[in-house]
């Protein structure tokens, strides 16, 4: 028996439950298995650009995207209401009271409580105790100077720094000065404290633009941890060494919170002093969350299948599962189910829009499509080519149905903000398409002006739609003011994307890319350009953290969504574009660990 939405706390009315069959007739769908062998690709007739303006405008880009890796897999995964009920009952009745008592225990010092909170965060169960954690941290932050003065343990200070900053408290970095020698450098003796070094490495990712000491800490710890893990006579235990390797590959701050939990549970289970209650709670919670994710993927796969765009528009990237993975980065807690569904639907349909502009449409077709988006009128598309009508109708109807769904909750205005962002995306897509058709390489600054508009801020806007516990007008006004945090998010995405998709996109003739623009403008090698762009990238990350810690115009839940926006790029674009080509790389394994395999209890 398949679990229904109402069985485990989702909204009674399904979001966008049906699609007009006359608008989206069913044809055929890819039915690929989970085989890791790439399936046969669709081949579109592509005409290369020539020097003739007419030919230039009528040419189609050359792009062949691999089909979906997952097909209809999640539609066949069985789910039972009893599973949800059993997990929920044990979590609520047995686990939560025990852990709540741990947090409130008078035997624990402030430092011990903070370390417990850190453990709960890493295990993915801190969200169950938001009120208790806020009370503990609020009280401790008021006594921070005294706490720091009495503490000289590197791991503890670094843990406090990570906890306070990720929870929105601006703990100063001067606490790390005590670990420096007379020469102003971090003491070499610290390298003997392996766990302290690892925790300092994680904390070092949370610096702001003026905190040079955090850059020093990152360089100091990374070099020594890399040496430690590459040394065959290393003193770290095998499971700790593996944990360090994982951190060096992808720091916690750059990972999805639920993936941090998945990996940390495996590590924590091998710790000799692990707490059985916390370990069991973490396993139950992960499996409970996983059931929600599978149900949501079933709903989304059904929705995507009914739209049937993968067969009608075979040039697009059919990536509903990968898009959902990105939405999961924004919020993993079960209560945000509706938010994940909304973000996935909008992002997937915007991906269709993007691929039409980048990978198939001629310049006149792209121009007419973008113009239609500016007018935002379904009755004004009769003159569009048939396939362009399908693209516009798909985006328009998806947003209209979401608006109808959210109107009773008083969330229409934020949906309109999302529509405005899509219109802005269209203008940027058109500008970049013109460059591509003309093989024009703009200056780096010109490119970034439009490239930043196709980055991450719109993703944040989509995530606000279902944040019913936050004031809509307050959120909209802040977002529309174009805060520095949004610019920094765009910069992080744009640079990471352009560096790690460079080879793939240049092979498709997409010469107007940030890395290529920088190389040409400054007359430097690829390696030199990457080095300079990474400096810009690093500074953007610092701005994100600074804005997260200092912004007061919106509540912390909104800022957390923004902080989380950048997390999936370290999976999609870690070394290459795994979103576009998911058959090669680690992304498919990560998705499998989240959505296919539960943790044995």
From Swiss-Prot:
Keywords: Cytoplasm, Lyase, Magnesium, Manganese, Metal-binding. Expressed exclusively in flowers. Its cofactor is Mg(2+); Mn(2+). Mg(2+) 3 binds at residues 497, 501, 505. Pfam families: Terpene_synth, Terpene_synth_C. Pathway: Secondary metabolite biosynthesis; terpenoid biosynthesis. Mg(2+) 2 binds at residues 354, 358. InterPro entries: Isoprenoid_synthase_dom_sf, Terpene_cyclase-like_1_C, Terpene_cyclase_plant_C1, Terpene_synth_N, Terpene_synth_N_sf, Terpene_synthase-like, Terpene_synthase_metal-bd, Terpenoid_cyclase/PrenylTrfase. One of its GO terms (molecular function) is magnesium ion binding. Binds 3 Mg(2+) or Mn(2+) ions per subunit. This is Terpenoid synthase 17. It comes from Arabidopsis thaliana (Mouse-ear cress).
């Amino acid at each position: 028996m398949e679990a229904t939405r109402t069985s485990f706390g989702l909204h009674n009315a399904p979001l966008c439950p049906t699609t007009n069959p006359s608008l989206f007739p069913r044809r055929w769908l890819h039915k690929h298995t989970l085989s890791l062998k790439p399936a046969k690709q669709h081949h579109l007739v592509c005409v290369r650009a020539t020097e003739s303006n007419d030919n230039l405008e009528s040419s189609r880009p050359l792009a062949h995207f691999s089909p979906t890796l997952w097909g209809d897999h999640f539609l066949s995964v069985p789910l039972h209401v009893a599973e949800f009920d059993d997990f929920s009952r044990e979590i609520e009745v047995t686990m939560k009271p025990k852990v709540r008592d741990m947090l409130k225990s008078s035997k624990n010092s402030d430092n011990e409580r903070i370390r417990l909170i850190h453990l709960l965060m890493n295990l993915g169960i801190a969200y169950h105790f938001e009120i208790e954690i806020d009370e503990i941290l609020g009280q401790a932050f008021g006594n921070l100077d005294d706490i720091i003065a009495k503490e000289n343990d590197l791991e503890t200070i670094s843990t406090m720094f990570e906890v306070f900053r990720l929870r929105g408290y601006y703990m100063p970095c001067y606490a790390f000065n005590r670990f420096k020698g007379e020469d102003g450098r971090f003491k070499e003796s610290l390298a003997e404290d392996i766990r302290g070094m690892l925790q300092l490495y994680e904390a070092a990712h949370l610096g702001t633009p003026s905190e040079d000491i955090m850059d020093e800490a990152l360089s100091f710890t990374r070099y020594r941890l890399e040496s430690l893990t590459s040394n065959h006579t290393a003193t770290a235990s095998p499971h700790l060494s593996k944990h360090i390797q994982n951190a060096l590959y992808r720091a916690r701050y750059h990972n999805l919170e639920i993936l941090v939990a998945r990996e940390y549970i495996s590590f924590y289970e091998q710790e000799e002093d692990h707490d059985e209650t916390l370990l069991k709670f973490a396993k139950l919670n992960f499996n409970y969350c996983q059931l929600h994710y599978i149900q949501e993927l079933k709903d989304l796969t059904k929705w995507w299948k009914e739209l049937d765009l993968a067969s009608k528009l075979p040039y697009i990237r059919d990536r509903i599962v990968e898009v959902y993975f990105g939405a999961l980065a924004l919020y993993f807690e079960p209560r945000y189910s509706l938010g994940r569904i909304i973000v996935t639907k909008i992002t997937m349909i915007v991906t269709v829009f993007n691929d039409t502009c980048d990978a198939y449409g001629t310049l006149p077709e792209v121009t007419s499509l973008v113009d239609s988006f500016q007018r935002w009128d379904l009755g004004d598309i009769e003159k569009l080519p048939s396939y362009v009508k399908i693209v516009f109708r798909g985006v328009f109807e998806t947003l209209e149905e979401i608006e109808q769904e959210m109107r009773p909750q008083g969330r229409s205005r934020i949906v309109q903000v999302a529509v405005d962002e899509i219109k802005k995306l269209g203008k940027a897509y058109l500008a970049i398409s013109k460059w591509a058709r003309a093989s024009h390489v703009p200056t780096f600054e010109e490119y970034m002006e439009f490239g930043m508009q196709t980055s991450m801020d719109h993703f944040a806007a989509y995530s606000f739609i279902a944040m019913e516990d936050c004031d809509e007008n307050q959120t909209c006004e802040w977002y529309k003011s174009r805060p520095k945090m949004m610019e920094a998010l765009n910069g992080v995405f744009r640079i990471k994307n352009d560096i790690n998709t460079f080879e793939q996109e240049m092979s498709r003739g997409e010469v107007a890319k940030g890395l290529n623009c920088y190389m040409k403008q400054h007359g430097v090698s690829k390696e030199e350009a990457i080095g300079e762009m990474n400096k810009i990238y690093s500074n953007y990350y610092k701005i994100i953290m600074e804005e997260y810690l200092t912004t007061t115009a919106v509540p912390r839940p909104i800022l957390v969504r923004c902080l989380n926006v950048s997390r999936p790029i370290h999976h999609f674009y870690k070394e290459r574009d795994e979103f576009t080509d998911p058959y090669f790389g680690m992304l498919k394994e990560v998705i499998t660990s989240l959505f296919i395999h539960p943790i044995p209890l």
